[in-house]
Amino acid sequence: MGMYKYIREAWKSPKKSYVGELLKKRMIKWRREPVVVRIERPTRLDRARSLGYQAKQGYVVVRVRVRRGGRKRPRWKGGRKPSKMGMVKYSPKKSLQWIAEEKAARKFPNLEVLNSYWVGEDGMYKWFEVIMVDPHHPVIKSDPKIAWITGKAHKGRVFRGLTSAGKKGRGLRNKGKGAEKVRPSVRANKGKTK
């Protein structure tokens, strides 16, 4: 087995491998950090590489913390019955991973989100690492593997559901029977997709 296969096997079931102990120690530190943190190198090198990361200029890796559970909506100021407040049981219709990608994109508006992956969770939070690319960097522009991201069509791609997590949330992994309301978009089908 090659190095990447060993890493992948260890991360398949973190609690049973050496990753579990490492994660416990890391999370103590991660909880005290800001929500969005730029990091030097990926925690899961195998996953990052398979999702398009390269150790070269123009690539940035960001760790994002997202609160678990449904959406906490702002409280109404006007009077009403507590049951009609509309505070609870309103999910954001997006995965936490997609939300993490959006947080990273807002923090670094000059970069585009390439992809992301899970790195840990506890009772309150989930952590994701987001691979970001600088579309204006000459190294990125001259690399035929990633130069597509410099095009106008990919500007703000995470906010339009064009990343892998976004496409999954929009139901675009399914086709055929049962997926009639998925394409061309959720909005075009008047929200019947979800």
UniProtKB/Swiss-Prot annotation:
NCBIfam families in the record: PRK04243.1
Protein name (record): Large ribosomal subunit protein eL15
Region (Disordered): 164-194
Pfam families named among the record's database cross-references: Ribosomal_L15e (PF00827)
Gene encoding the protein: rpl15e
Keywords: Ribonucleoprotein, Ribosomal protein
Gene Ontology BP terms: cytoplasmic translation
UniProt biased composition (Basic residues): 167-176
Family note: Belongs to the eukaryotic ribosomal protein eL15 family.
UniProt GO MF annotations: RNA binding; structural constituent of ribosome
HAMAP family cross-referenced by the UniProt entry: Ribosomal_eL15
Domain of life: Archaea
A GO cellular-component term linked to this record: cytosolic large ribosomal subunit
